Swiss-Prot record:
<dbReference type="GO" id="GO:0051536">
    <property type="term" value="F:iron-sulfur cluster binding"/>
</dbReference>
<comment type="similarity">
    <text>Belongs to the NifU family.</text>
</comment>
<comment type="subunit">
    <text>Forms a heterotetramer with IscS; each subunit of the IscS dimer contacts an IscU monomer.</text>
</comment>
<comment type="function">
    <text>A scaffold on which IscS assembles Fe-S clusters. Subsequently gives the nascent cluster to other proteins. It is likely that Fe-S cluster coordination is flexible as the role of this complex is to build and then hand off Fe-S clusters.</text>
</comment>
<dbReference type="InterPro" id="IPR011339">
    <property type="entry name" value="ISCU"/>
</dbReference>
<dbReference type="GO" id="GO:0016226">
    <property type="term" value="P:iron-sulfur cluster assembly"/>
</dbReference>
<dbReference type="Pfam" id="PF01592">
    <property type="entry name" value="NifU_N"/>
</dbReference>
<dbReference type="GO" id="GO:0005506">
    <property type="term" value="F:iron ion binding"/>
</dbReference>
<protein>
    <recommendedName>
        <fullName>Iron-sulfur cluster assembly scaffold protein IscU</fullName>
    </recommendedName>
</protein>
<dbReference type="GO" id="GO:0005737">
    <property type="term" value="C:cytoplasm"/>
</dbReference>
<dbReference type="InterPro" id="IPR002871">
    <property type="entry name" value="NIF_FeS_clus_asmbl_NifU_N"/>
</dbReference>
Length: 127
């Protein structure tokens, strides 16, 4: 199976690798995994007082498609509102990265991770 140039670019030069303090009230963290393949994805967002995602980072243990999906999503959410980030769908990730059918689960993980990070952020703001 050959990866697309975009997958290879994000895999070889991942953007936004790292982590924020999970105790920061402006940080939302999402941790998701796929037991079938062993991929684990942690994605975090940092939201400003206007509800705009000003930064994002990730740490992913998995294949090139999982790393590329994480990297791409952290780029996409920067500068977006929470609502805009929530609307990101795995199908858009698949199209952008030209993922083969056997790697679609990686895009689902990325969508689930951003939604989990947003849920965590919202939970912190309510409490």
């Amino acid at each position: 199976m050959a990866y697309s140039k975009k997958v290879m670019d994000h895999y070889e030069n991942p953007r936004n690798v790292g982590s924020f303090s999970s105790t920061d009230l402006n940080v939302g963290s999402g941790l998701v995994g796929a037991p079938a393949c062993g991929d684990v994805m942690k994605l975090q967002i940092k939201v400003n007082e206007k509800g705009i995602i000003e930064d994002a980072c990730f740490k992913t243990y998995g294949c090139g498609s999982a790393i590329a999906s994480s990297s791409l999503v952290t780029e996409w959410v920067k500068g977006k509102s929470i609502e805009e980030a929530e609307s990101i769908k795995n199908t858009t990730i698949v199209e952008e990265l030209d993922l083969p059918p056997v790697k679609i689960h990686c895009s689902i993980l990325a969508e689930d991770a951003i939604k989990a990070a947003i849920s965590d952020y919202k939970r912190k703001k309510i409490n």
